[in-house]
């Protein structure tokens, strides 16, 4: 009985390791010309959000997608091979958003900055992108936005309001690198701010009703 149980245990471990290896390998697979599916669609969406892919999203990795990937790789100092491997994906996730993440960005902008001038709405989005790219904050928009106490609109529920078209345009501009805040990581309204700490931050610029700080 002990031998039989031991054999089963070995089989389970072997199968589990094999399955894990296959899963890991699949997750790390490189997209290239000829690839197709949801991952390619996501890749195209991110490249389109960055203004590098101007075609319809097809889910097929063709010449247009390869050219867009090469442009991204050149822009961000990566090896220019036209393939979406692990390093390219890592950079894409740092400097771009997928569709659901773009929805989050638009919600933040609308709930935090509706009524602000357009540049002020872009500025709020830029702060979000700056946090994603900063080692001081989480490396994805969900964790940045829902970090405890990070955004008043999340705390008071206004985040869940439906964003308008302008919010999406501002989100797109922020993702594409427009940063009128000079790399700010925080902002506040001096008329309503209750935190003494925020006033100690070095101030970079005032846009509309918000002061943007390091």
PLM regions and their residue ranges:
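Acidic, Ser/Thr/Pro/Gly-enriched interdomain connector segments
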Residues: 2-56
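A generic alpha-helix surface/boundary motif
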Residues: 41, 86-87, 103, 122
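Active-site-adjacent loops and short helices of periplasmic peptidoglycan-processing enzymes
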Residues: 84, 94, 99
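Short acidic, glycine/serine/threonine-rich helix-capping segments at coil-helix boundaries
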Residues: 32-40, 48-90
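Bacterial extracytoplasmic/cell-wall-associated proteins, especially those involved in peptidoglycan
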Residues: 99-214
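Second-shell loop/turn segments in exported
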Residues: 29-34, 53-59, 77-80, 94-95, ...
